[in-house]
A protein has these predicted regions:
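Acidic catalytic/metal-coordinating carboxylates
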Residues: 13, 33-37, 60-66
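The feature encodes the CheY-like receiver
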Residues: 15, 57, 75, 87
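Charged docking surfaces used in two-component/phosphorelay signaling
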Residues: 16-24
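Alpha4 helix (beta4-alpha4-beta5 surface) of REC/receiver domains from two-component response regulators
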Residues: 19, 60-63, 86-103, 110-118
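Short hydrophobic/Thr-rich beta-strand motif most characteristic of the beta2 strand and flanking loop
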Residues: 26-33, 41
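Short amphipathic alpha-helix used as the core "switch/output" element in two-component signaling
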Residues: 40, 62-75
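Active-site beta3 strand of CheY-like receiver
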Residues: 45-51, 56
Length: 124
């Protein structure tokens, strides 16, 4: 059975790249262009990993993650944030969210694959 991934990103180019990289890695990929839709999909599909932009049109990625962490069905899903803010302020926003990490933009395909692999191994 394929592992499931959810990509939440409002930038169509980033969404497509992340989706393609995950599909090549063998994931069934679900997509959302905002946090509210992403939260709904996460609750329904229970993906093995969530890739989420830090800045979404309807709420911050950290806020969406906190909502997911409060739900017993989604609280343990690893979340990898994608952000252009790899400086201290960007890390600060997500550092207290359990079972999460980040990938900087622009996305390096090798780093992306390595980070996803690390989170899937930890979750297994």
């Amino acid at each position: 059975m394929k592992k499931k991934a959810l990509v939440i990103d409002d930038n169509a180019n980033n969404l497509l790249l992340e989706k393609d990289l995950l599909e090549v890695a063998g994931f069934e990929v679900f997509e959302a262009e905002n946090a509210a839709v992403g939260i709904d999909i996460a609750r329904k599909e229970k993906p093995d990993i969530i890739i989420m932009d830090v800045r979404l049109p309807d709420m911050r990625g950290s806020e969406a993650a906190r909502i997911l962490r409060q739900d017993k069905e989604t609280r343990d899903i690893p979340i990898v944030f994608v952000t252009a803010s790899v400086m201290a302020e960007g890390k600060e926003e997500i550092k207290n969210i359990t079972n999460s990490g980040f990938i900087g933009k622009p996305i390096n395909t090798r780093t992306f694959a390595k980070k996803i692999s690390q989170f899937i191994k930890c979750a297994s």
